[in-house]
Amino acid sequence: AMPINNMLGYNFRLGEIECAIGMEQLKKLNGLVESRRALAERLAAGICELPGLSVPYVADGNTHVYYVFPLLVDPDVAGVSKFEIAEALKAEGVILATQYQNLHLLPMYQQKTAYGTSGFPWSAEFTRQDISYEKGICPVAEDMNDRTYLGFGMCTYDLTESDVDLIIRAFHKVWAHKVEMSR
């Protein structure tokens, strides 16, 4: 059987009906993004003082759409791992992603087997053959994936201010009880 998880650059083309729906949805985009920004700012303000937790930084003149609300945990300062934090927040009803896949570590790159069994683009004569995707070439991304990154999928939910306030309370509850988590 041909592997289905080793295709680079899927070509997803939309039909007319999907495009019509998309055109209508785009009319709502600015309002949805502004609402999500306001909620993200509320969330960031509510949890930014928790020791060992970093909220997204947006430099002046830049914007963020908060597809994901990324957090960084310093386990040494927090006193617990990101996995323990995620598990405790899950018990409070807040679901966080604990990993953001490092693409260079996917089997497709490790084995250089894209596009079925052809090995393209690595098998092509115009491709450098000495390209390595070994663990360690992206140390910051790998550390984030292994130890520090947590992500809240803000675009997954139709959140209200009161929902965000509940999430903030859940974070504070977890931080108040993190000593118990590390036992």
Language-model features: where?
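PLP-dependent aminotransferase class I/II
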Residues: 1-183
